From Swiss-Prot:
PROSITE patterns: CRIB (PS50108), PROTEIN_KINASE_ATP (PS00107), PROTEIN_KINASE_DOM (PS50011), PROTEIN_KINASE_ST (PS00108). This is Serine/threonine-protein kinase STE20. One of its GO terms (molecular function) is ATP binding. InterPro entries: CRIB_dom, CRIB_dom_sf, Kinase-like_dom_sf, PAK3-like, PAK_BD, Prot_kinase_dom, Protein_kinase_ATP_BS, Ser/Thr_kinase_AS. The keyword Cytoplasm applies. Its EC number is 2.7.11.1. The active site is at D817. SUPFAM superfamilies: Protein kinase-like (PK-like) (SSF56112). GO terms for cellular component: cytoplasm; nucleus. Gene3D superfamilies: CRIB domain (3.90.810.10), Phosphorylase Kinase, domain 1 (3.30.200.20), Transferase(Phosphotransferase) domain 1 (1.10.510.10). It holds the Pfam family Pkinase. Residues 698-949 form the Protein kinase domain.
Amino acid sequence: MTDTGYTEELLPGTFDALSVRENGGNTESDTSSIRKSQNQDSKQEDVHRENLSVQTLEDHTEVTETREQSVSKDLFDLPRAPASLDVKGLQESDEDHYVKDLSDYKSMDPGKPGTVPTNVSEIFNSNQPTLDEPIQFTRVSSSSVLSESISEGDADLISHLEGKVEEGNNLTSKETPGTIESIVGDKTMSTIEGSSQNIGRISTGGRMTPDLSLMGGALETSSDFLNSTQTSNSPKITTPITEVDANDVYESPLNEILSSTDSFNKASTASADHSKHVSVHEVIPEEEPHPETTNEDPPIKTPVMVNNFFENQTPVSESRSPFRTISSPFSSLRKNVKSQHGTPDHSQRNSNSSTSSNDVKRKTGTKKKGVFSTFVQNIKRNSHSEKRISSGSGNGSGNNAFKISTPYNAKHVYHVGVDSKTGEYTGLPNEWEKLLTSSGISMKEQQQHPQAVMDIVKFYQDVTENSGEEKVFKTFKVGGGSGANIASTPSFRTPSTASVQKFETPQMQTDATFPNENNDTPYSSNLQGPLLTNDFSETVNNEKFIPTRPAPKPQGSSTVSRRVEIPSPINSLGHGTPKVQRSDTQSSSIFSFKKMPTLKSEQPLPPIPKAAEKPANLLPARAAPTPPKPAIPTTPEQSSIPAIPSGLAVEVKEESNTSNVQTRKAQEKKREERKRKNQQIQSKLTEICTTGDPSKLYKNLIKIGQGASGGVYTAYELGTNASVAIKQMNLEKQPKKELIVNEILVMKGSKHNNIVNFIDSYLFRGDLWVVMEYMEGGSLTDVVTHCILTEGQIGAVSRETLKGLQFLHSKGVIHRDIKSDNILLSMNGDIKLTDFGFCAQINEVNLKRTTMVGTPYWMAPEVVSRKEYGPKVDIWSLGIMIIEMIEGEPPYLNETPLRALYLIATNGTPKLKDPGNLSHKMAMFLNWCLMVDPEDRGTAADLLEDPFITEIAEENTSLAPLVKLARMKKLAESMEDDENDEDKYDEQS
């Protein structure tokens, strides 16, 4: 070795490359010198291998000692803060500058100055390209590079010198053919790239997180680093390895070195000096990815450790924001494990590595990395406990912050459509479907008349809602000039029958103009508070009852979806004479009336008895019933206000307080107004009623009925011994006291032989006593049930009923409930109408026929269909009552109420069971009464001129035997019922 010397320069990743250096001598050219040189080369290689083994063993011993010291220290320092190093990767330069010793690479910790070898500094100062951009990483162990740079032969040699690894540092791995998927105990990953030939030819796989205090702006990435082989979208690199038998336990001699190296300890210690603590919620700046260029791939990012928590960072696609939020590492870990393996195995993770090129195959064997399993288990336990605490506190704070209340005032608006194919309704409410199903209306019938079904269901519902109300006068405008205008509110209640005890008439507009029939000068009256003023000096001169509102206008051609709003008042209550025209106004409608074409203008009105002259100074036009304003149905938008959370601003509370104050003021104002009105009504009743105790003026009071507001009694007047009916009412329980005043005034001013007349009224101890005529013969229902009437007797009943209807219609009153229950007879056969107003309901109640079950059968089609109607609805009801007298019951009585309404609306004129038994005159009269079109239907005055009334009808006295027979049969039935009840009682006792 005098002429030529060999210096071993160990290259990263190879151990057989020698660099020949000349010492200045001349080389001999003979063959012997060449052979000698070759022999020396072989000997030198042997020496080199021996030196390498010794050097590696020494390095291993030194590292082991250092590890033992660091482990003892780490036991008290756990957990440590994350390390942040600013280390530039090693790369091979074009001038072949090599690392001269593997030991030079062992320590890369900038926290220990002076320990970095000079060879490394020379490499840093070289002109070779460097990585200017800092690289994120958790820990970089020099042992990973060391294990990478050991060849197979050297690994076999060292494997004999190493014992078993401690149990706490064992590596748990999942071995599959071609890959090893492992997760280290501390949840960290290091990406190792290299080849068995030259580590300098490969870009560094692991990137280290720089010191946050030294991090500047975005730095450019080295072109050599970007040339690493990886996928641009998801750079997950798995190192192909040889298959390992799953049953074999592989123990690497470098496990101790890999698990705890000098670099590992130095990096952990230096983290306290060069990096700040990063909380889980801190945002770490992340370098912005460069746009894709030729032969350039996005950099690989290693997992980042934050506050002793480790996160497996998946490749991030290009994003506009250069920041990301660090979240819990274990949630991402579970997500990755589930997506890769299907089971949440927290002890396994892919160990990623890269290959230098497609031409070079890795020759190294399988590698495993040991970790502190107990350290990781502590982290897991602490993390789970913190999560439980945080979740519990979160729930508690959420409960204390605000509470979600349940819905209130909820309304469900239905939209009903029609199936174009089947014609069936879709979206009907359940209640309506049940009604249609239980009513017996078949699906075919629903398809044939869908609009009729909708109308009768709506009508049925409205009547049911009003079942608890009391009946009041239903009036209309009659005769006297076509230019009369009456203002009325646009919302009206649906008419009902006598059994439905409550009816509501709309309020009149405050100022309404009526024609004065004595002259053409209209006069104005205040109808808002009728009969509460002192303007009652005008004379009546045989005027009409109450020229108030006409029949209300229906909804017209409204859509199906509007018709099915539940509930809503019916706006259509009439059709026929008089004709009504409604103009569009905001709060009221103007009605113009034409003269009734069927009413004879020259026909004299029946004279008013002289007994009525005393109260005749009242103005009838002011006697319009004025109930309280009906509730306006709210739209879905106005239905309810959602609950206000407690955490809203103070302004909202102030607004709500202000609104509450305003509401209270409005309520107080209404209360005062109601009190004032009650005082006025009380004063007016005292004015019009007779003073005294009615119990001392009448004898033998027998209670025959009981209503919601009082009872009905029969008595005999002292002196005359006339039979009377007394209706007792508690004024405190009357919601419409002003209507009572109106009716008393109307009945006082009207007397007719075919009307149950008003006798007197008394106000005693807060109770109102209304005394009226009483018909001892009972109702026509008893006669129809127990007797068979002839055509002459039917004609007599029809004539007397038409006389009473003519009188009511001439006064502008629609009875609306003509049926046998409301036709009363005396023992002499006299016939009077009753139940045309609130105070007139004094007949004995028949529960079966006065409930909703018995009411719809006498109704006119225009009422059922919710169209406009007028006084001719009473004529239709008279025709149904004639059928009742012929056959003993009205049509469709055996049908359900809803189906009866449907048949009335769709069938038109009902058919008789045996029409051949009727005479021609009677059949023509009945047909005239039952015309479907109200315009073709006769009026009361016209029907009184019909031959059936003038020629066939008998005198009233012909009815007296029927009345007596009916009373006897009824008495016998009652006695039989009493005996049956006694027998049942005896059997039970």
